[in-house]
Amino acid sequence: MPRVKRGVTARARHKKITDAATGYRGRRKNVFRIAKQAVMRAGQYAYRDRRNKKRVFRALWIARINAAVRQHDVTYSVFMNGMKKVAIELDRKVLSDMAIADKAAFAALVTRIKSVVNAAA
């Protein structure tokens, strides 16, 4: 069996890592050992934060809905309870966008839910 030299595969492997590390500061961008560690850690952060992003955006949507609903003298929890009672299945992302972009439609929605909640109470 002939001897296989690793030049081509090693260069390709190193190039893949150094290409992924472009834009990093200091030796992290061009020293293979350090770049490899930096790329691995960046991958871990990216994996973790793809999951955290979902939590962060949900919290943002809830804060926006709460702020918009309080302008109509309703709390977020009462509003969402009314949404369930009326059987309107708009998610928080759409409600948040509606509160910003289409204030008239959002106000109509809030008044409808207020009437249902007040009738039940």
From Swiss-Prot:
CDD domains registered for this protein in UniProt: Ribosomal_L20
Keywords: Ribonucleoprotein, Ribosomal protein, RNA-binding, rRNA-binding
Domain of life per record: Bacteria
Gene Ontology terms describing biological process: ribosomal large subunit assembly; translation
Role of this protein: Binds directly to 23S ribosomal RNA and is necessary for the in vitro assembly process of the 50S ribosomal subunit. It is not involved in the protein synthesizing functions of that subunit.
UniProt record similarity statement: Belongs to the bacterial ribosomal protein bL20 family.
Designated name of the protein: Large ribosomal subunit protein bL20
Lineage: Bacteria, Pseudomonadati, Pseudomonadota, Betaproteobacteria, Burkholderiales
Gene: rplT
